[in-house]
Amino acid sequence: MQLQFLGTGAGQPSKARNVSSLVLKLLEEINEVWMFDCGEGTQHQILETTIKPRKISKIFITHLHGDHIFGLPGFLSSRSFQANEEQTNLEIYGPKGIKNFVLSSLRVSGSRLPYRIDFHEFDENSLGKILETDKFTVYADKLDHTIFCVGYRVMQKDLEGTLDADKLREVGVPFGPLFGKVKNGQDIVLEDGTKIIAADYISAPRPGKIIAILGDTRKTSASVRLAVAADVLVHEATYGKGDEKLARNHGHSTNMQAAEVAKEAGAKRLLLNHISARFLAKDISQMRRDASAVFEKVHVVKDLEEVEI
């Protein structure tokens, strides 16, 4: 499981950073890629990666500001060319209005897609659990921005315990079909009458990963709720230390406020993104150092960077 950042800039593209988009790679888990936001130029960024557009099965939009959605029409159209014979349908989750934006853009431009898009829109009254599969659950909660904006909490369900193969061999279980039965939780009886209780040879279920991905926001209690015990928290840091008033006036956060959220939530790692173009390389280093005084495991991400979860 990996996060790859396609755009880490704030508001508008710069030479160093494109506007907002990232993907959660779940190839080993479910052979899918989930995208979060799709700012202008996202499809160009994808060309610099190994991501296959047809593997992107779900897109989660945090809010309807242009730097988070203007890349959708182009990406959706290009995806139809690249899918070839393996047409894969797509689901888009986001605030009310995202369906109208996408369909209007496609209609006005005369674009026709060979795959189906299922829209899942929500407002302030329909948040909470927005998706559940056999392996993942996704929650959305309202943040505090200048327009309706949400953050997402992706929870992987507990993983099956692992089989202790060495222990099985020690008690005389031959490698082969019997191993498979025990792994599937089935008790077996050996030829000599020895009964093997499967539960004795399988470790306890392992907790799944938790990933919190927030849209644009001031510091708010919802951010903490979404990030509780998260393995990774992705939080915006449009402003730096000392710019709290500016951040509040414009509906954003500072690096220090993001660090406070991570600390209060008990998150394991903090990844700062949505970085203003006014921050140069030396400023980014200082931004990380300042935030680490509040929350140690912090990193400022850059475009195309991939982070293992």
Curated annotation (Swiss-Prot):
SUPFAM superfamilies: Metallo-hydrolase/oxidoreductase
Superkingdom field: Bacteria
Positions of Zn(2+) 1 binding: H63, H65, H145, D216
UniProt entry tagged with the keyword Nuclease: yes
Keywords: Endonuclease, Hydrolase, Metal-binding, Nuclease, tRNA processing, Zinc
Cofactor note: Binds 2 Zn(2+) ions.
Listed CDD domains: RNaseZ_ZiPD-like_MBL-fold
Hydrolase keyword on record: yes
Binding site for Zn(2+) 2: D67, H68, D216, H274
EC number(s) from the headed UniProt entry: 3.1.26.11
Any single Pfam family the record assigns to this protein: Lactamase_B
Cofactor: Zn(2+)
Catalyzed chemical reaction(s): Endonucleolytic cleavage of RNA, removing extra 3' nucleotides from tRNA precursor, generating 3' termini of tRNAs. A 3'-hydroxy group is left at the tRNA terminus and a 5'-phosphoryl group is left at the trailer molecule
Family: Belongs to the RNase Z family.
Subunit (UniProt): Homodimer.
The protein, known as: Ribonuclease Z
Biological source species: Streptococcus sanguinis (strain SK36)
Gene: rnz
